[in-house]
Structures are given as structure tokens and as C-alpha cells.
């Protein structure tokens, strides 16, 4: 039950969460990070049951209030950096888009749904909440049906972390060019994709 349903005048009405982000300032370095992606994954895991939609502020780093950024990564609000480079949080939303069907598992660090066709989709996140930068390993075991040997299945894993799907790291490794070359932008776009195992 949603809180809104306890108020007769609001019961059953749509709730839309609009223009939210992890910080209210347009140049917060956290916006460009994997930590932001994990934080948003956790936040989305708590929003979906009673809300019709949610709208992250904003899709791209280039918008009228501040103009074109001076560097590709500057802590802008967007899911996509200047140069059409997807940030890690972009993938959080791409992964969540697949979570249709029935929620069968929700915890502090994961969400799994079962689709109508019998397949499963899940999102697992692992933020560094202690602020010390220490790695915390998250391990999941997938239990297959007893007769899985006679069935076809595929376990596809897409990873975004500090080493994969993280164009900010590559930009740092390139020396943080304010105006990256065409080849550097292409490289950052390529490494912005999740690692698939």
C-alpha cells in the first residue's frame, strides 16, 4: 500500500517524481561517477511500486541554464556528458528499463524480476558507502531449476564499475583534455559501454 492511498482525495492517483538528482548543484563531481550510478540504482529500487514515472534531471550535460560545458566531465547533471558520452548512471536507467514483470526479490543491493516469458532480469549495485574507497565484494548465487540440464538458458552479465563502463576514468587517464580530439571522444564513447560476460 502506498501512503497516498491513505488519503481519500489522492487514492489511486498517479504519482510522478520529476527533476530529481543526487545533488542540487550543476557541477557536483559525483554526477560523473560509478558511485552515483549505484546510489541511483538503490534509489530506483525504492520508487517503482507506487509511482507512474520518474524523471532524472537531466538527460544531457548541455542545457540552456549553463550552456555548453568547458570539459566533457565537470559534474554536470546529465546522464550523458558533452560529446554524447554515456556516464555510468545512464546504464542504471538502461538496466532498470528491462525490469518489467513481477518483482521476486528486493534487497539493499539488488532487485530481480520475473518476466512473462519465464526469463529473469536483475540489477545488483555495490556503492562505496564508507567513503574510504575500500572494495566490498558482492556475491550472488543463482539457483537454477532441478531440470535445467534439459533446458536452454543464458546467464548474461553486464558490468559497470570503476574499470568497466567508466569513461571518467579514461578521461583522467588521457590527462583530462578540455577539448578532446575526435579519436579521444570515440574512445570515451567506446569504453562507456558495460563489460559483458
Give names to the regions the model predicted:
Residues 7-11, 147-149:
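Short helix-capping segments at alpha-helix termini
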Residues 125-197:
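C-terminal beta-sandwich/jelly-roll accessory domains of carbohydrate-active enzymes
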